[in-house]
Amino acid sequence: MELFGVPIQTMYLYTLIIAGSLTLLFLFFGDVFSGLSEGIPFLNPTLVLSFFTCFSAGGYIGELVLPLSSLLIALLSCILSIMLVVLLHIFVLVPLSSAEESLAYREDDLRGRLGKVITAVPVDGFGEVVIEGIGGTISKSAVSFDNQQISYGTTVLVVDINNGVLSVTPHEPI
């Protein structure tokens, strides 16, 4: 079968090369175009490019291997591509989009947070405090702000941070 005077097998190959190249470019420069698909989530460029890549690859291989009509091969390739794109969307893109970005924090962000002593803080000495949050758990060295001993398991309030060491005081809920 021919399409626009070109054999369908050649069209599949050209589409595969173009879609594969665009997919590779989108992989490297996708952040530049990230806002284009905000309003229409089902037209995610990753899914569209993946569909055309899978469709053209399936059609090309089908034309080489299967002794079926070109329309049936195109239909089978389209169905296979839709299934692969749906699986890609459900099992890769949705979990990646809902994943936490990082555990990056500034030390100033810890000021005013509550933590729990995991190594007792002696008078004029160092202990350790763990601060739990949505992004994860942070463990930091700590000294007593009031120069008093703070025992294990005490809930503390971070008052200040000096050179990566937290100054804490026991927290008393109101």
Curated annotation (Swiss-Prot):
InterPro entries: NA-bd_OB-fold (IPR012340). GO terms for cellular component: membrane raft; plasma membrane. Keywords: Cell membrane, Membrane, Transmembrane, Transmembrane helix. The keyword Repressor does not apply. Plays a role in assembly of FloT membrane rafts, probably recruited to rafts by FloT. It comes from Bacillus subtilis (strain 168). Belongs to the NfeD family. Disruption phenotype: Alters assembly of FloT membrane rafts; more diffuse rafts are seen. Double floA-nfeD2 deletion mutants are wild-type. No visible effect on FloT membrane assemblies. The chain crosses the membrane at residues 16-36, 47-67, 72-92. Induction: Expression is sigma W-dependent. Up-regulated by alkali shock and by infection with phage SPP1. It is a multi-pass membrane protein. It is found in: Cell membrane; Membrane raft. This is Membrane protein NfeD2. The gene is nfeD2.
